Amino acid sequence: MIISILACTSAGGIGNKGTLPWPKNSEDLKWFKEHTTGQIVVMGRNTWDDKMMPKPLPNRTNCVVSNRLIDNINVRRLKGNIKQEVLNLQAQFPDKNVFIIGGKTIYEHTQDIVEIVYLTRMLKSWGADTKVNLERLLMNHRIKTVKPGTDCTYETWVRQT
């Protein structure tokens, strides 16, 4: 299954100056870890380069979309057609979920093949210089569950058939 997982502001803000717009949120990090551990994570080069992110993410197959070499033997580099690369991963590892974890360009290029979106919506306003179009990202999906968090809500969206 191909799944997008992201946290954003109500305006779709996902990044500010190369990192998350809000301070570390342990509750959201736990949610992310619970869903992605043991699975495949696909990210863009800017997400990989975020200083706040451990490299590689432990107990996951890390894949980075980049035309440049990745200086880490524990990472698989993807290049070319992002959507096709993700579909290839799904075919290669049918027993695993492929999680799209950012950034903006990776979400945009894969939104047509994503079956589930795990969306953490931050309740406070945070300045962001990178935003996703939530309306477009969630198009053809319907909300399945909403769980309240401390400073956020956890939403699960599923593709309509």
Question: Model-flagged regions — what are they?
Answer:
Residues 1-161:
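Enzymes that bind and transform nitrogen-containing heteroaromatic metabolites
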